[in-house]
Amino acid sequence: MFPMMTGFMNYGQQTVRAARYIGQSFMITLSHANRLPVTIQYPYEKSITSERFRGRIHFEFDKCIACEVCVRVCPIDLPVVDWRLETDIRKKRLLNYSIDFGICIFCGNCVEYCPTNCLSMTEEYELSTYDRHELNYNQIALGRLPMSVIGDYTIRTIMNSTQIKIATDNPLDSRTITNY
């Protein structure tokens, strides 16, 4: 008779334990019902990037002195810098500058170590193309001003899931949204 009683007691304990686990998981589900969704509907909604987001690299041709520091600090030797030495003024003259974003790992070393600050990271992250050769940007494509996510009124911008407090008198700008 005792083995039968211990079997019933084990069954009862397991039933209570299972009910407790189900109750705990249900409480977690209910606690998440009050939160905003994490996912967004991408083509129609875009999230605003943080201030230090490493997107497409912006290049200013006039500031570049062709020192090739960006090539030396790049872990994959990616930027291609073509220059010619002007003998009459004894300076380098930049002819061509290009970066292949199909290979770039967006580490930001080139931007950090550039002595003239001619390189900067933008908030632009839509670089997808159908042909990988279109990702090879020359100095004209790199010099193009970045498209702001906030400035595009055809889509709904989503600020990260945390509540961001922005004063109504300040214009909505990517520089003012830093409370991520």
UniProtKB/Swiss-Prot annotation:
Q: Which cofactor does it need?
A: [4Fe-4S] cluster
**Which Gene3D superfamilies does the protein's record reference?**
3.30.70.3270
Q: How does it sit in the membrane?
A: Peripheral membrane protein
Record-level GO cellular component terms: chloroplast thylakoid membrane
Q: Which reaction does it catalyse?
A: a plastoquinone + NADH + (n+1) H(+)(in) = a plastoquinol + NAD(+) + n H(+)(out); a plastoquinone + NADPH + (n+1) H(+)(in) = a plastoquinol + NADP(+) + n H(+)(out)
Enumerate the InterPro entries for this protein. 4Fe4S_Fe-S-bd, 4Fe4S_Fe_S_CS, NADH_quinone_OxRdtase_chainI, NDHI
Q: A Pfam family matched by this chain, by name? A: Fer4_7
Detail the disulphide connectivity of this chain as listed in its UniProt entry.
none
Record's superkingdom? Eukaryota
Binding-site list for [4Fe-4S] cluster 1: C64, C67, C70, C114
Primary localization class, coarse? plastid
Which GO annotations describe the biological process of this protein?
Answer: photosynthesis, light reaction
What's an example of a GO molecular-function annotation for this chain? 4 iron, 4 sulfur cluster binding
- The segment(s) forming the 4Fe-4S ferredoxin-type domain are 55-84, 95-124
Which keywords annotate this record? 4Fe-4S, Chloroplast, Iron, Iron-sulfur, Membrane, Metal-binding, NAD, NADP, Plastid, Plastoquinone, Quinone, Repeat, Thylakoid, Translocase
The listed locations are: Plastid, Chloroplast thylakoid membrane
Entry binding sites for [4Fe-4S] cluster 2: C74, C104, C107, C110
EC number(s) stated in the UniProt entry for this protein:
7.1.1.-
Determine if Cell wall biogenesis/degradation is one of this entry's keywords. Answer: no
State how the cofactor is bound: Binds 2 [4Fe-4S] clusters per subunit.
Q: Which family does it belong to?
A: Belongs to the complex I 23 kDa subunit family.
- What is known about what this protein does? NDH shuttles electrons from NAD(P)H:plastoquinone, via FMN and iron-sulfur (Fe-S) centers, to quinones in the photosynthetic chain and possibly in a chloroplast respiratory chain. The immediate electron acceptor for the enzyme in this species is believed to be plastoquinone. Couples the redox reaction to proton translocation, and thus conserves the redox energy in a proton gradient.
How it assembles, according to the record, is: NDH is composed of at least 16 different subunits, 5 of which are encoded in the nucleus.
Q: What is this protein called?
A: NAD(P)H-quinone oxidoreductase subunit I, chloroplastic
Organism lineage string? Eukaryota, Viridiplantae, Streptophyta, Embryophyta, Tracheophyta
Name of the gene this protein is made from = ndhI
